[in-house]
Amino acid sequence: MNAVSMTVIGAGSYGTALAIAFARNGHHVLLWGYNPQHVRELQIHRCNQAFLPDVQFPDNLSPEASLETAITASRNILIAVPSHVFHQVLYNIQPYLNQHSRIIWATKGLEHGTGRLLQEVAREILGDKIPLAIFSGPTFAKELAIGLPTAITVAASNAEFSEELQQLFHCDKSFRVYKNPDMIGVQLGGVIKNVIAIGAGISDGMGFGANARIALITRGLAEISRLGIAMGAELSTFMGMTGLGDLVLTCTDNQSRNRRFGILLGQGMDIEEAEKQIGQIVEGYLNTKEVRMLARRIGVEMPITEQIYHVLYSGKSVVEAANTLLSRTLKDEIHDKVCF
């Protein structure tokens, strides 16, 4: 078998889908999961019965239980784990990295407890010499895994790395890869859209209709853009795949856990029961606190995020939160050519 082109760390639905997509493109891929029993089941059944039971693994996708073997087998390490364990995963893989290693992640989140960008976390743990990149964009795991047409964006710490990843993983038949040099913007778009999607779900669960949903999406995009610009991101990034594209997808399609979680809250279900019914990690719930923390630290107003935070963490009712948003002081939509 050919040399390993990519090791994927994280055998959940999204990590598995990415591994399948890369393998389908002719690359030898290793897929590592933290649970040895789960990895053994992947090896036996040649599919991920827990998350993607109907999608068989290509022959060149190899589940791997040894973290050392997985990391040392390839220079390209793609991390696809929930954001709250991203920090620990980097610490775990760091001893096995070498001067040729390169780190990519598809995790959409901020560091738990600090609100830091994952780029900052990676630099702190891994140092300045290892190239870093992000895969982000409007993708649902199942559609990616079964080979439906999908587009994604890569942002990297240097142009050469970005170009190589684009060429490595682009597939004319189903998987289109765009480049974007704006690492900050690409990260923020992928994080905050999950928070806004909870709000869109709450609105739909309350029966507010399509008008309210699109208002939340539009003003949510304004919040993402405000914070991004304040942190040095490019406005154009938020008009692209990792901004507007990912936001619209996550706010409007019921494959989104964040949207479904919000719908349940809007229908009156409590948070614990809604989490249980979703059955998988809801990144927007985990990251609302961190996004609010980051916005307050930077000094950026994010009223939708603020109200979602109070619903999730302060016991505010969804009705009260909606009334608070609707009764805010009237203002201009456009300021300095930006939708603020």
UniProtKB/Swiss-Prot annotation:
Keywords: Cytoplasm, Lipid biosynthesis, Lipid metabolism, NAD, NADP, Nucleotide-binding, Oxidoreductase, Phospholipid biosynthesis, Phospholipid metabolism. Disulfide bonds: none annotated. It is an enzyme of class 1 (oxidoreductase). Transmembrane segments: none annotated. PROSITE patterns: NAD_G3PDH. Its EC number is 1.1.1.94. It catalyses: sn-glycerol 3-phosphate + NAD(+) = dihydroxyacetone phosphate + NADH + H(+); sn-glycerol 3-phosphate + NADP(+) = dihydroxyacetone phosphate + NADPH + H(+). The active site is at K193. The keyword Ligase does not apply. GO terms for cellular component: cytosol. Gene3D superfamilies: N-(1-d-carboxylethyl)-l-norvaline Dehydrogenase, domain 2, NAD(P)-binding Rossmann-like Domain. GO terms for molecular function: glycerol-3-phosphate dehydrogenase [NAD(P)+] activity; NAD binding. The keyword Lipid biosynthesis applies. InterPro entries: 6-PGluconate_DH-like_C_sf (IPR008927), 6PGD_dom2 (IPR013328), G3P_DH_NAD-dep (IPR006168), G3P_DH_NAD-dep_C (IPR006109), G3P_DH_NAD-dep_N (IPR011128), NAD(P)-bd_dom_sf (IPR036291). It is found in: Cytoplasm. It holds the Pfam family NAD_Gly3P_dh_C. Catalyzes the reduction of the glycolytic intermediate dihydroxyacetone phosphate (DHAP) to sn-glycerol 3-phosphate (G3P), the key precursor for phospholipid synthesis. Belongs to the NAD-dependent glycerol-3-phosphate dehydrogenase family. This is Glycerol-3-phosphate dehydrogenase [NAD(P)+]. The lineage of its organism: Bacteria, Pseudomonadati, Pseudomonadota, Alphaproteobacteria, Hyphomicrobiales.
